[in-house]
Amino acid sequence: MSRSGTDPQQRQQASEADAAAATFRANDHQHIRYNPLQDEWVLVSAHRMKRPWQGQVEPQLLKTVPRHDPLNPLCPGAIRANGEVNPQYDSTFLFDNDFPALQPDAPSPGPSDHPLFQAKSARGVCKVMCFHPWSDVTLPLMSVPEIRAVVDAWASVTEELGAQYPWVQIFENKGAMMGCSNPHPHCQVWASSFLPDIAQREERSQQAYKSQHGEPLLMEYSRQELLRKERLVLTSEHWLVLVPFWATWPYQTLLLPRRHVRRLPELTPAERDDLASIMKKLLTKYDNLFETSFPYSMGWHGAPTGSEAGANWNHWQLHAHYYPPLLRSATVRKFMVGYEMLAQAQRDLTPEQAAERLRALPEVHYHLGQKDRETATIA
């Protein structure tokens, strides 16, 4: 054995590893990154952005959306599929989904007769929340006070449904590309009698990290990202927006409170005001990236609720995920197919490159005229 305690082969391997590390550049060389929140890996292949695109191009959405359409079931005064007439609402409007995926009184399946064929009870409620009475606006085109009303409605419905159900999932699918069948600004709320798969993974990961390191995973992650800065998109007094180190979608972002907060209802008035403001800035940047109404799916994750709401959930940190599909332009999207479906997620653009592009974008919406832009910038 050598004096260093390693044989020549080990020294050669160590030397080769050092040489590889010295030449590695994340923006040029493929590598895999770990997602500690959801316990999975993503393949990053930034060099693929140099290839010419010959795949599918989505059609440009040039259709003008009317401000009010009496035939649109989400508009004030419209008749919905169940025959009910919407009120003449002027802010947010919450109602039961006419075609729910979960119902509160569904019968339970019987016991399984084989471990490979298991089924369990699934009960819950599904609601729809309209953000605004007008169909021709989206969140980035709404005022900060109007978005604040949405935040308050999110907190209220979480508290209401969370009194009975262990998981309340708020999510928004924006744009036809993400399967949204109605252009009216709205989201959905599904409350379930069970923890969905992703919630279970985040529960296990956050609990394990807190047990091992003594603090919440996402609190430490936020501190590290604030120090490193390269993936930050927006920061404010109470919130930060970043492209996660492990992002799978091209311009995916994570929205986090700076303070330790477990659920939406725990947000203070100041935090809610600030959340409305930073959401407007983020979504404006999204729209400005390709000068289009940027499609995405987003949703909130917080500590479980229901009968166990009073348990110790201090390992949880409230957060929102934004998953937009666009990659190269308003008409070229990322597809999660093939390798992603059969092996693991893969991305071309690095998270650092995505964050840099989003940071550089203006916080005034491209739809505004020059005079409006100057006024908004001064304000």
Curated annotation (Swiss-Prot):
Cofactor binding note: Binds 2 zinc ions per subunit.
Biased composition (Low complexity): 9-21
EC number(s) given by UniProt: 2.7.7.12
Active site residues per record: 186
UniProt: UDP-alpha-D-glucose binding residues: 81, 97-98, 173, 188, 334-337, 339-340
Residues that bind Zn(2+) 2: 202, 301, 319, 321
Phenotype upon changing residue 201 to C: In GALAC1; 2-fold decrease in activity
Entry protein name: Galactose-1-phosphate uridylyltransferase
Native source species: Homo sapiens (Human)
